[in-house]
Amino acid sequence: MRSEVDLTTSALLPCSSMPKTQHFSPDTFKFLKELKRNNDRDWFTANKQRYESAVRDPFLRFIADFAPLLHGISASFTADPRPSGGSLFRIYRDIRFSRDKSPYKTHVAARFPHVDASKDVSAPGFYLHLEPGTSFAAAGVWHPDAQTLTRIRAAIVNRPAEWQSVRRSKMKVEGDRLSRPPRGFDPEHLFIEDLKLKDFVTSVSFSEEQVCRPRFIMDFAASCKKMTPLLRFLAASLELDW
């Protein structure tokens, strides 16, 4: 279950420096709701200008405005506002190997990865997901390759005090999980349930009302800061700078 917290932003910027610009609006979610009901190319083509003005362009501005806030959390992560090849995920689905041939995603999202692994979709990073009824911030690694997963598990075993500190940060670490202990690890280990994880992710939920507030960018930054214990541990596990 994702955390729902009252976030403070005072540690990030003085009040006079807090961005006041509203990035997202009810029109953002209205478009996504309508897209879910009309997920076909003809409808999207007819409404592409709405997508750009209510969804894509506000998100690109958000990414650009978030960059200095992200740098204040860690200079090792990047916010890239380019419309193609940057932080923003494409709205188009890859349907080549999917039974669901719906051409478009019904959510919009961006990733803020570690600069030394920005081309790796499973690299440690922050993430923002906007979807009607399911909006959240997240941090961690999602579906890492076998080598990365082994390095993270080894770090949990070799640095148990640091991992215990992550567990005490009040942010629940979640992900898909093996049904049995991973090969090569003690099935009686204190953190065996964590070692079974195939993803290492923590998250904070937001309502549509929160996302549409002018101060949402600060709330998102504060949620990222709250999730740093896990991300710092993962970066160290993979010998990435913080």
Question: What does each of the following model-derived ranges do?
Answer:
Residues 3-4, 10:
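Intrinsically disordered, low-complexity segments enriched in serine/proline and basic residues
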Residues 130-186:
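Compact, glycine/acidic-enriched structural inserts
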Residues 92-155:
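Aromatic- and glycine-enriched beta-alpha-beta binding-site module
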Residues 74-104, 108, 174-183:
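A short, surface-exposed loop/turn module that caps and links secondary-structure elements
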